[in-house]
Structures are given as structure tokens and as C-alpha cells.
């Protein structure tokens, strides 16, 4: 296990942070593809369209081309989902990380370094909702490089956010993560985050039945002592 050090973000980290974030999101493309492939409506298309074409034309070549087209379309949709998410983040809060996360005492962005390389990242900022009865901090952009998984780095990054929230007087830490991010969900729930609901942010996510899972960690809960 290589040693790592968690510290606050610096402007010189921007390129390595973006690369880590992009690679982390691209890892979810195969899982998204498999999820869409196994949906009942997809299986129906994979059976129905080629069969209809064969009965109409008698051409096995046309059947193979139709199956290939369906597979490529599913892969494109899976790839598009995560590429769109990356571009959206890079043009909003991650366009200027220093301004978004480092210009206020109530928000922060951390990186994990190992042997001079950026191997982890996580961010946090307050939830701005005047209707909230509790002061909430939102955890965002948790990512750990593939080579440093299963070393406890993900948990250490989350604990960093929880400790920061506690010091800043927040009552809860909240986050949203895709149901397709299986490892992240297991990590959060294993650390005491509780599911509070599901949200479909796009028509495509509703179509493929892959909601965002909303989670909450109460800093007044029994788990607080584990920080």
C-alpha cells in the first residue's frame, strides 16, 4: 500500500484533477451499457427487430447488421451519459475550482497525493436552500484512481468531508450518486449514509431506469463518534 497525503486543492492541481475525474467517470460506461442491455425493453428489441427483418428479407446479413447497430447505439448512449456529465461539471463548478470551493470557509476541495501523483479528490459546499431546517453540506466529486482502490483512501476522503462539516457546524452531509456507481454506493452506506430517496434528473435516466440515489449522513447520529 503506497502512502498518501490529503491536502487542500491548489491551482497547480487543476489538470491532474480533471484527468482523474474524467477517467473515473469513464469507468462507469461498461456498467451503464450492461444495465441498458439487460432491460426488458432492450431484450425485446434485440429479439424483435432482427426477427422481423429476417422474416421480411430472409437476409442473415441484415439481421447481423441490425444487432450490431443496436449494440453500438446502446454503447453510444452509455458513453454520452458520462461524457455529458463530465462536460457539465467542467463548465460549471469545476471550471474554476478555486473560486467555487476555496473562496469561502464553508466550502473546500481536497486532493490525495501519493508519490507526487494526484490519486484522489473530493469536494464539499453548502446546500443553498432557504426552506431547509438543517444546515447541510453537499459532498461532491469523490474519485479515487484505479491503482489506489481498496487501500482505504475513499473512506479517508469521506471522513475528511465529515470532519470538515463537523468543524463548520453543519448538521448533515448529503450527496447524490448514480445507482450504477455500485462501489461508491457501497462505500457511502457502509460508512453510515442513509438513503433518503431517488431522483431522475433526465429523461434518459428515467428511460433506462437508473435514478440518482440521494443519501444523508447526520452528524448528530450515533456514527459521529467514529469520525
UniProtKB/Swiss-Prot annotation:
<dbReference type="GO" id="GO:0005634">
    <property type="term" value="C:nucleus"/>
</dbReference>
<keyword id="KW-0812">Transmembrane</keyword>
<dbReference type="GO" id="GO:0031965">
    <property type="term" value="C:nuclear membrane"/>
</dbReference>
<dbReference type="InterPro" id="IPR000182">
    <property type="entry name" value="GNAT_dom"/>
</dbReference>
<keyword id="KW-0472">Membrane</keyword>
<comment type="function">
    <text>Has histone acetyltransferase activity in vitro, with specificity for histone H4.</text>
</comment>
<comment type="similarity">
    <text>Belongs to the camello family.</text>
</comment>
<feature type="transmembrane region" description="Helical">
    <location>
        <begin position="36"/>
        <end position="56"/>
    </location>
</feature>
<keyword id="KW-1133">Transmembrane helix</keyword>
<feature type="transmembrane region" description="Helical">
    <location>
        <begin position="58"/>
        <end position="78"/>
    </location>
</feature>
<dbReference type="InterPro" id="IPR016181">
    <property type="entry name" value="Acyl_CoA_acyltransferase"/>
</dbReference>
<feature type="domain" description="N-acetyltransferase">
    <location>
        <begin position="61"/>
        <end position="220"/>
    </location>
</feature>
<protein>
    <recommendedName>
        <fullName>N-acetyltransferase family 8 member 7</fullName>
        <ecNumber>2.3.1.48</ecNumber>
    </recommendedName>
</protein>
<dbReference type="Pfam" id="PF00583">
    <property type="entry name" value="Acetyltransf_1"/>
</dbReference>
<dbReference type="GO" id="GO:0010485">
    <property type="term" value="F:histone H4 acetyltransferase activity"/>
</dbReference>
<dbReference type="InterPro" id="IPR050769">
    <property type="entry name" value="NAT_camello-type"/>
</dbReference>
<keyword id="KW-0012">Acyltransferase</keyword>
<keyword id="KW-0808">Transferase</keyword>
